[in-house]
Each structure stands twice: as structure tokens, then as C-alpha cells.
A protein has these predicted regions:
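A short, compositionally biased micro-patch
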Residues: 6, 43-45
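Short, surface-exposed charged micro-motifs
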Residues: 2-3, 39-41
Length: 159
């Protein structure tokens, strides 16, 4: 979860559910909190991702964004889990799943259309708008993110 407000013993947190941006109040006794000094910013207009840890840029790369009919959703999301894939897969070696979902698709690949940051088997597409809503990045960069960003890292996606 990402805490968005703190009122005494109550925390308002982002939830990994539809619709994107859903928040709920939880009592501090129900959760364990920690401070994460990592952040990812994705600028869709510039088609660029910048990731920082402790204020230091660890990745600054062009990206593939969602196509016109399957756009990448905007807003604050957070990193929920990593999935390892085979090196030559369409997703590259790692998928960094986020707390958001496609707003254009009801289902994807037999399941819910979770938005993710992942590698690619088509590096020539980097810089284009041609995904189903996910952010595709070079495989060497997704490895850096996997090794550096903890679960819960906030991800801000801007138009």
C-alpha cells in the first residue's frame, strides 16, 4: 500500500483494485509501515521513465506507452510484485506489476488487465505508443529496477 494521508491512528491508503486510485482508511494496528526512499516517474508525453532511490537517479530511459485505443492510465500507482519471465519473452526477463488496471480492456491474456512495467523482445519499439497499456523498457533497465526498487515503490504516471 501507499499511504496518502495520516490522521492519528488512521491511515488512508491506495488499494490495488479497480477503479484505479481507490483509497480506504485502515487502522495502524492492521498494517506494518515502512518508509521507501524510491520513486518512479513516467511522463507519457515525453515517453520517458525516471527512477530514483535515495534521491539518486538509477534509470532514465525512453519507454513504449499504450497505443491510442489502449492508453496507459495516469495517476499514482505502486509496485505490487515482480514476475520473472524467460529472457526471450514479449515481457523481457521481468515484469514489475503495478496497482493499476487498464481502463480500456476488461480482460487481457485470460486475466485482469494489470498495468506493469516490463522488458521487451522488441527494443526497436521503445519510444513508441504501441502497447496494451503497459510500460515497456529495455531489458537491461528492467533488471536495474528489479534489483533496486522495493515493493510499494510509488509510481506516478503523468499525461
Amino acid at each position: 500500500f501507499v499511504v496518502t494521508e495520516n490522521h492519528g491512528e488512521w491511515l488512508k491508503v491506495l488499494l490495488p483494485v479497480r477503479p484505479n486510485g481507490t483509497q480506504r482508511w485502515v487502522h495502524t494496528s492492521q498494517v506494518r509501515t515502512s518508509t521507501i526512499q524510491a520513486h518512479v516517474a513516467i511522463n507519457l508525453a515525453e515517453r520517458r521513465l525516471v527512477a530514483t532511490v535515495d534521491g539518486t537517479v538509477i534509470a532514465d530511459t525512453p519507454v513504449v506507452i499504450g497505443a491510442a485505443d489502449t492508453p496507459t492510465p495516469t495517476g499514482r500507482l505502486f509496485l505490487t510484485h515482480y514476475d520473472e519471465k524467460s529472457e526471450g519473452s514479449a515481457y523481457g526477463p521481468w515484469v514489475a506489476a503495478l496497482s493499476g488496471f487498464s481502463q480500456a480492456l476488461d480482460r487481457f491474456s485470460g486475466g485482469v488487465p494489470v498495468i506493469a512495467i516490463h522488458g521487451t523482445n522488441n527494443p526497436a519499439a521503445v519510444g513508441q505508443a504501441r502497447s496494451n497499456g503497459c510500460i515497456r523498457i529495455p531489458n537491461d533497465v528492467i533488471r536495474v529496477l528489479r534489483d533496486s526498487l522495493p515493493l510499494g515503490t510509488p509510481v506516478d504516471i503523468w499525461p
